[in-house]
């Protein structure tokens, strides 16, 4: 065991008698004060099915730490349920919770001089929140994903929570009746686990597996299956070994690791939120990662997995087909993955993938062969233009034509937009603008799943565009562009668009444009005034004051001094 344990600051020497006295009260004995103290950041909560099974995993982590020769100390972290808060004022707290989680893990681990930490989370912001904390602290760390939910079933079809969101649009358009709507509601979420498609939670857990901060195959396991608990205990053993060998996050989270993550996110058809979160983690650790890197990688990596929201299958199907390691092996064989990247186990990516088959199983079509991809290029395009000089993120999977030019339909909030869609006031060819929903303007950069699902449900998914300085749920698909930067609140051009202006979204040319002269835009800009802050105190007020542009990951600790 290393002599440079951080916890020696509270366990060694006569001056630490009172410290040890308190530790004895929580279970330490004479032989435990030379062991590494390992934090268990427990995201258990009954707020959401994503996190409701995590307490059992945390107990398995404790057992694993003890068996490996460490002393666990468990503490809680918060979560917000994106699915439950979606479409409400509460959604403004979702992205904020990412930074609250990061702050809480950093505070507990550094405040208690812990030697390492195993973080266990489920809902979307749990993953990046934990990883930001790990990047800040740079102590041995591993992430355990709470696991994915199994699909619901109704009328012979697999359901996810997004099925319920889309059913609202179908119902308002008269396509389904009240009984069908209620049946979908009752069957969409059958138990514990995070939302089942390749939505944000499963995207980020997959990214962390690729980056080497979670164990192989762990990101696609079902929350309720025994292998998830077994993997948690194994993760604890791996972490204690990393403490002994001082394998640190900043040795793992290199430029190569981020490039690997982006490649796999493209290959599995992952969430737009991954762009924001990876930028934030890279920003924290000092890795030079920009929006342009996502576009470069997108152009060379095909979408190999036919997963919801735009595809047919859910994450448990991906697990059965070989999981993330199978996708990684295919990318490695085609020169699109850095095999020499280090992982928390001490092995390289290439070493971990050595025994993984070169090709996916023949009797499935969840993971396509290299010669028969779902799409020849990645699905997350970075657009720029006079509407987004810093950039914006477009999700172009599941759309027949990634180009549209049409009249702007301008809304100052998500609620106004949703009301218009459900009232049948949006027509084919329209380009919806939802603004003042950015990191500062919202604040909190709400996800627009309710409006986009209503568009899909109304049958307008291929004929209506939607642009916002807010975000999209991982469950969103269609011709949608989010993360527009600069945002409206800080004077971005999206705040100058007027009803009826001609707007162009062109994913092929990577263009996001309002077709108005520069002279006209300059005149509008001269007359524009920043709105009063929506919140001046409390968590949201503090967040709006500190948060950076989405093009930098919307972090809250950049350029503080």
From Swiss-Prot:
InterPro entries linked to this entry: DHAD_IlvD/Edd (IPR050165), Dihydro-acid_dehy_C (IPR042096), DihydroxyA_deHydtase (IPR004404), DiOHA_6PGluconate_deHydtase_CS (IPR020558), ILV_EDD_C (IPR056740), ILV_EDD_N (IPR000581), IlvD/EDD_N (IPR037237)
Q: Which Pfam families match?
A: ILV_EDD_C, ILVD_EDD_N
Q: Which domain of life is it from?
A: Bacteria
Q: How is the cofactor bound?
A: Binds 1 [2Fe-2S] cluster per subunit. This cluster acts as a Lewis acid cofactor.
- Catalytic reactions of this protein: (2R)-2,3-dihydroxy-3-methylbutanoate = 3-methyl-2-oxobutanoate + H2O; (2R,3R)-2,3-dihydroxy-3-methylpentanoate = (S)-3-methyl-2-oxopentanoate + H2O
Whether Transmembrane counts among this entry's keywords is no
Give its E.C. classification number. Answer: 4.2.1.9
Look up the record and name the pathway of this protein.
Amino-acid biosynthesis; L-isoleucine biosynthesis; L-isoleucine from 2-oxobutanoate: step 3/4; Amino-acid biosynthesis; L-valine biosynthesis; L-valine from pyruvate: step 3/4
- Signal peptide from the UniProt entry: none
SUPFAM superfamilies cross-referenced by the UniProt entry: IlvD/EDD N-terminal domain-like, LeuD/IlvD-like
Q: What class of enzyme is it?
A: lyase
Q: Name the Gene Ontology molecular function terms of this record.
A: 2 iron, 2 sulfur cluster binding; dihydroxy-acid dehydratase activity; magnesium ion binding
Q: Would you kindly state one Gene Ontology biological process term found in this protein's UniProt entry? A: L-valine biosynthetic process
Required co-factors:
[2Fe-2S] cluster; Mg(2+)
Q: Which UniProt keywords apply?
A: 2Fe-2S, Amino-acid biosynthesis, Branched-chain amino acid biosynthesis, Iron, Iron-sulfur, Lyase, Magnesium, Metal-binding
Q: Identify residues that carry N6-carboxylysine.
A: 125
KW Cytoplasm (keyword) present: no
Write out the function statement from the record: Functions in the biosynthesis of branched-chain amino acids. Catalyzes the dehydration of (2R,3R)-2,3-dihydroxy-3-methylpentanoate (2,3-dihydroxy-3-methylvalerate) into 2-oxo-3-methylpentanoate (2-oxo-3-methylvalerate) and of (2R)-2,3-dihydroxy-3-methylbutanoate (2,3-dihydroxyisovalerate) into 2-oxo-3-methylbutanoate (2-oxoisovalerate), the penultimate precursor to L-isoleucine and L-valine, respectively.
PANTHER family, per the entry: DIHYDROXY-ACID DEHYDRATASE DAD, DIHYDROXY-ACID DEHYDRATASE, MITOCHONDRIAL
What is known about its subunit structure? Homodimer.
Q: Which NCBIfam families match?
A: ilvD, PRK00911.1
Q: Which family does it belong to?
A: Belongs to the IlvD/Edd family.
- What name does the UniProt record give this protein? Dihydroxy-acid dehydratase
Organism from which the protein derives: Crocosphaera subtropica (strain ATCC 51142 / BH68)
Gene transcribed to yield this protein: ilvD
